[in-house]
Amino acid sequence: MKNKTKNEACPFRLRASRDALEIIQGKWRIPIVISLMYGTKRFGEIQRDIGDVSPKMLSQELKALEENKIISRTLYDSMPVTVEYSLTPLGHSMEKLLDELLNWGNHFRKEIVGK
Amino acid sequence: MKNKTKNEACPFRLRASRDALEIIQGKWRIPIVISLMYGTKRFGEIQRDIGDVSPKMLSQELKALEENKIISRTLYDSMPVTVEYSLTPLGHSMEKLLDELLNWGNHFRKEIVGK
């Protein structure tokens, strides 16, 4: 067996990454944020962007993102009442992370799926 | 209600991001990859880096990462037999994504937790 360098991983890096992972976990949160990168939207418009998310799940995930201050929900006192979702500055700060996710997703697809 | 630009999210972006998300999903895969960024390691060394992962879960997640060609597993015919894990080139290609995850995790912590 070759002699290899074995350094312990930086606990600071591990913690920060786990914080981020906790926020973006699951199948729907990142797609929701990507959808709202394209502008303020109503519930049905987000659902249309994502395609295969159930209303119940979308509603739950929007709530979680709102609690974490990634998106904001605005209620308009119109007839009928209108609700719109948009990214907060914290939500917009995810843009570079999403770009890297996209880059790596493409790379992975090319390497593994081969197209 | 103001008139706002409402563009549909790019389906290509959504698909690539979902590919990437599927690979890194869960609490442990990213920490495992971070641990192995610091060098080839044995099971116990990875477990020590991460801290609170159970052996059963770690074993399951290492297997999933191996199936997706993110890590490789090498068996040494020593006494006792030794198993080592390391990142493949595809695993190493996650470095920029992990950096952004770390950056955003720090930013999020400062904004929300306030420290």
State each model region's role.
Chain A
Residues 69:
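Glycine-centered, phosphate/nucleic-acid-interacting loop/turn motifs that mediate DNA/RNA or nucleotide
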Residues 72-73:
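Short beta-strand "wing" residues that participate in macromolecule-binding interfaces
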Residues 1-12:
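N-terminal intrinsically disordered/low-complexity leader segments
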Residues 61:
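Residues within the DNA-recognition helix of helix-turn-helix
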Residues 77-101:
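Basic, amphipathic "hinge/linker" alpha-helix immediately C-terminal to the N-terminal HTH DNA-binding motif
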Residues 14-17, 21, 95-105, 109:
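Hydrophobic alpha-helical core bundles mediating ligand binding, dimerization, or RNAP-core interactions
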Residues 12-57, 77-78, 84:
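N-terminal helix-turn-helix DNA-binding core of bacterial DNA-binding proteins
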